[in-house]
UniProtKB/Swiss-Prot annotation:
PANTHER family: DNA REPLICATION AND REPAIR PROTEIN RECF (PTHR32182:SF0). GO terms for molecular function: ATP binding; single-stranded DNA binding. This is DNA replication and repair protein RecF. ATP binds at G33, E34, N35, G36, S37, G38, K39, T40. PROSITE patterns: RECF_1 (PS00617), RECF_2 (PS00618). Signal peptide: none annotated. It is found in: Cytoplasm. One of its GO terms (biological process) is SOS response. InterPro entries: DNA-binding_RecF, DNA-binding_RecF_CS, P-loop_NTPase, RecF/RecN/SMC_N, RecF_2. Belongs to the RecF family. The RecF protein is involved in DNA metabolism; it is required for DNA replication and normal SOS inducibility. RecF binds preferentially to single-stranded, linear DNA. It also seems to bind ATP. GO terms for cellular component: cytoplasm. It comes from Rickettsia africae (strain ESF-5).
Amino acid sequence: MKNIFLHSLSLENYRNFKNLELKTDNTPIILIGENGSGKTNILEAISLFYPGRGLRSAKLANVCKTSEDHCLVKALLQSKLGLAEFTTQFKRSSNRRITEYNESKIANNELSKFTSMVWLTPHMEGIFTSGSSDRRKFLDRIVYNFDPKHAELVSKYEYYMHERNKILVEDIRDDNWLKIIEEKMADISNHIANNRLKTLEFMQQAIDDLENEFPKADLSIDGIVEQKILNGKKNIVSFITAELYQTRSKDKLLGRTSFGVHKSDFLVKHQKKNILAKFCSTGEQKAILIAIILAEMNYAIKLTKIAPILLLDEVFVHLDDKRRQYLIEFLIGLNMQLWVTTTNLEGIENFATKAQLIKL
């Protein structure tokens, strides 16, 4: 098994940190400090070395320390391709983010070629009751860990969709270019939908196989393209292309693309109660989310032979003793780098003896 982990992390003008230098090992790491000390900021900085905008999905201008023009995050990281230096920096004046791998610029969606991460934050506990966009992004992040090329596909799809919207809204008379764009969107959609379905199959098996103290979930996806594939429809690319063509007039008025894999929803059910997670109590929702994360970790390691970095923000809060102890034993048994935030060590003393403590 290959472990992805940080050897060091350096922050400059990042949120509340003017400068911060951390040295770490391939072990559990506990960030301990009062609320507002910057624990979650450190997790967020690490998450920037994975496709997307980090675990807060924050606007980049907001991550710079107040009154500073730039911020920098640097990491020496054991990646899928070996030891490497990664940097990501943002300048307010240019409103640009630049990410580098060993001093060579790379696109944000390329990061999944080098790293693998899973995270769980208090904000995510509302994912079952929020909009479908949050759940879809959550599912796609899971897919990244099984298929690193998926991030690039999602990025390309969003680019072509933006181009299509622009042509329609601005009434640009170029039917040939529009046809090419819709064909590209259809082809990419087919790959995205199949990747999601394949990952859901893996994840469902992982959930069913893992005996733990958390409720099991049934996973599915509610999307026209995915359902057509599940129903065995042939020529799926031609079907998507035709749908995009037929919705041109409607989408011109709406100013957006009304059909496609960007409209799909990730559905989660409490297996035993047979009800959608959004109708469960907040405590049950958190427990289901933890169960999904544990299954993802287990199966990602089993299938890809790669252990991701795990970021857990205040994960032990509001867990009963039985579940907290099970989670601690599970995490220790992973033998990988994971980052946990907490305001105190009460209830996790045993875990703390096996972790690197960083006090803020």
